[in-house]
Amino acid sequence: MPILMEELSSKSNSRSSQTYIVITTFLSLFALVGFAFYGLPFFFDFMAREYGWSRTVITSGNALGKLLVGPLFGFIAGWLIDKYGPRRLMMAGVLMMGTALIGLSFADSLGLFYLFYIFNALGYVCGGPLPCQVLISRWFDKNRGKAMGIAYLGIGAGGALVPLIAAGLEKNYGWHNSLAALGVMVVLIAFPMVWFIKGSSSARSNPEIREPAIPIRSILTNRNFYLLGIGSMCAIGVVGGVNQHLKLYLRDLDFTQSQAAHIISLVLLSSLAGRLLMGWLADIFHRKHVMILIYLIVATAVPLLLVNDFPGRIYIFAVIFGIGLGGDYMIIPLMAGDLFGVRALGRTMGIILVADGVAESLFPMFLGAMHDIHKNYTLGFVILICVALAGALIVSFLPKTGKAGN
């Protein structure tokens, strides 16, 4: 009887800890990705108007930050997470992201602009998707897809709220103060929860963390690693390009600040449904097939930005693109965990996220350059459609994983 009671108590504590982990990762992604990553593009047109910067220059901050930070700190962050756990790295990441947004609110020179975008990239690497993915994968064996889907709802929830909050703050206090306020909110939302994360040694609920990790050399010589990496770069590059330019595109169509904010909010609201749906599908069907579906949804949405206008066109785009966006970021760590194991997930995703970060930073710059040259987005959007379809084709060569019962 004492043994039975001890087992029941252990299971109850494990469930409570799992709930805390899901809430913490939800709020971290809500703040660092939803608020910070999706909030910054809302201010691009203000920067362009006040400082006279081109669209290529404005989107180059994200590119420079991730290209400088990603290749070095992405690998180091993955190794540190696997070795010491995510907590300390996440605390540093939250503080750096808050500093970045506050700094960008008064960065009136390109030097300061790039400096604080480096802080932005450091915060994203240390406190964003990578440690959250590892936390979820370490604490969950069964229902990992659902847990990842719930945690990733934080991105959609934060991203849906931030344009509305930013628009309201900007109207009353100006864009400088509203961007600084978002930086303060990021710290207040995420830091307290991250502070109380238990050490990785307590994550005994997932038996996979006791298995020996696959050597990194074996991962780097595995063709599936490159298929997953290149395929994800295609999809992340496409959604990154569209996201960074969506408000600028809407302003070209003479949407007001409020109308543009509501469209962006609809994209992120739709991503909530996408994350739940794709997380549920990922626990039922082969995850490769779910990944292909997501990439095809993204490829289907972008043409709506090219066709002649008709009633509801932008709103239909926002819903379809949002569903694809919701599943895109979430499915990659699930596939990586299936292919290479949870113990090596930090290092594996550290490398893949670096590659994805390169794509996510260069594609918006490319799209901005296409617009600066041709004065429209037509050619750039056509290329993005082709890249999304190429990603679906590449992913189709991955093995089947993740089906219930296998």
Regions found by a protein language model. Name each.
Residues 126-140, 327-340:
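Intracellular juxtamembrane helix-capping segments at the cytosolic ends
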Residues 47-48, 80-81, 164-173, 250-251, ...:
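Interfacial helix-cap and linker-helix signal at transmembrane-aqueous boundaries
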Residues 40-44, 223-276, 280, 363:
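Extracytoplasmic gate region of multi-pass secondary transporters
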Residues 88-102, 289-303:
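Structural signature of the two symmetry-related core transmembrane helices
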Residues 63-78, 265-277:
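Central cavity-lining transmembrane alpha-helices of secondary-active solute carriers
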Residues 151, 155-199:
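Helix-loop-helix hairpin linking two adjacent transmembrane segments in secondary transporters
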Residues 72-85, 275-286, 371-372:
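Helix-to-loop junctions at the C-terminal end of transmembrane segments
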Residues 30, 100, 112-127, 233, ...:
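Hydrophobic core of transmembrane alpha-helices in multi-pass small-molecule transporters
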